[in-house]
């Protein structure tokens, strides 16, 4: 069996993939966010939400559904350099969050800031440790820049990363947030080694 065939066999047999499709979500990432939401009460926050790296829109779908079910009218703005199919109740910005024009557009749609930032700006690890360190530092810098600009006091930032990068990013965030927790759940396959950082401000 070739590498692609092996991946496909794992993919279709994955219980999280089956569950996500049964719920009508675009990918298995919905299951991961649902677990994190159950653990940390993310969607129970009475606040606007900013989502970074939103394409293909799985987290946006989950946010939209949970907000509709709860009757919340808070705004959700998602940003990505890649195009994304429209999600009901979510305002999408096709742009780079590190660019001034995109930041200005986010500000115009979320003038009062947000209480929750969800981030999936997570480039895959490089086999070159030096290059990977640079990429990790850039991600941490971007998260801090966006948090300082938009995150309200007491707000939370949830960032998806890889285990190999989690400690580095957490060490940076701990200097700027009152609490930082690293979480990894059963829906992260071992060869992916995904981890999630929950950073909460004062």
Curated annotation (Swiss-Prot):
Record's protein name: Ribosomal RNA large subunit methyltransferase E
Gene: rlmE
Any one of the GO CC terms: cytoplasm
Native source organism of the sequence: Tremblaya princeps
Compartments where found: Cytoplasm
Role summary: Specifically methylates the uridine in position 2552 of 23S rRNA at the 2'-O position of the ribose in the fully assembled 50S ribosomal subunit.
GO molecular function, one term: rRNA (uridine-2'-O-)-methyltransferase activity
EC number assigned by the record: 2.1.1.166
Protein's UniProt keywords contain Cytoplasm: yes
């Amino acid at each position: 069996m070739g590498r692609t065939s092996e991946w496909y066999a794992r993919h279709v047999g994955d219980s999280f993939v089956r569950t996500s499709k049964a719920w009508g979500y675009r990918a298995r990432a919905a299951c991961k966010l649902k677990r994190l939401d159950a653990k940390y009460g993310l969607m129970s926050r009475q606040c606007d939400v900013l989502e970074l790296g939103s394409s293909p829109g799985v987290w946006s779908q989950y946010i939209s559904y949970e907000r509709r079910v709860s009757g919340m009218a808070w705004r959700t703005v998602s940003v990505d350099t890649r195009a994304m199919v429209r999600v009901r109740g979510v305002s999408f910005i096709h742009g780079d969050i590190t660019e001034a024009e995109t930041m200005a557009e986010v500000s115009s749609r979320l003038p009062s800031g947000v209480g929750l930032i969800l981030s999936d700006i997570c480039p895959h690890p490089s086999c070159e440790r030096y290059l990977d360190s640079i990429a990790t530092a850039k991600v941490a810098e971007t998260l801090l820049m966006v948090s300082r600009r938009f995150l309200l006091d007491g707000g939370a930032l949830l960032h998806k990363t890889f285990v190999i990068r989690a400690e580095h990013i957490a060490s940076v965030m701990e200097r700027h947030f009152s609490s930082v927790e690293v979480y990894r759940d059963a829906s992260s396959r071992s060869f992916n080694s995904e981890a999630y950082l929950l950073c909460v401000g004062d």
